[in-house]
Amino acid sequence: MSIENLKSFDPFADTGDDEASSSNYIHIRIQQRNGRKTLTTVQGIPEEYDLKRILKVLRKDFGCNGNMVKDDEMGEIIQLQGDQRAKVCEFLITQLAIPKKNIKIHGF
């Protein structure tokens, strides 16, 4: 006779099927710099889009400075000065036709 309910179970363990779905998301994060200064980062934009052109349009439309950072794990990341989370989300939905369910906004 085997007792089944004494097995250890970790509810926070990765199930394995999350890997494919998490790579499809676009993550918009805000980071605190010094004082009241903030930095908005956008990662996970699909490869079919030209990130340099997107960055150029974002900088012009929002009136802020920005640059691209190459990361080994995350790939190409767009950085914008200031809290641009809502504007970037609206831009991705309207201009690039990315569904809202594929965009994750992080921050305080």
Swiss-Prot record:
Keywords: Protein biosynthesis, Translation regulation. GO terms for molecular function: ribosomal small subunit binding; RNA binding; translation initiation factor activity. Transmembrane segments: none annotated. GO terms for biological process: regulation of translation. It comes from the Eukaryota. SUPFAM superfamilies: eIF1-like. GO terms for cellular component: eukaryotic 43S preinitiation complex. InterPro entries: SUI1, SUI1_dom_sf, SUI1_euk. Pfam families: SUI1. CDD domains: eIF1_SUI1. Residues 1-20 are annotated as: Disordered. Additional factor that functions in concert with eIF-2 and the initiator tRNA in directing the ribosome to the proper start site of translation. Belongs to the SUI1 family. This is Protein translation factor SUI1. It comes from Eremothecium gossypii (strain ATCC 10895 / CBS 109.51 / FGSC 9923 / NRRL Y-1056). The gene is SUI1A.
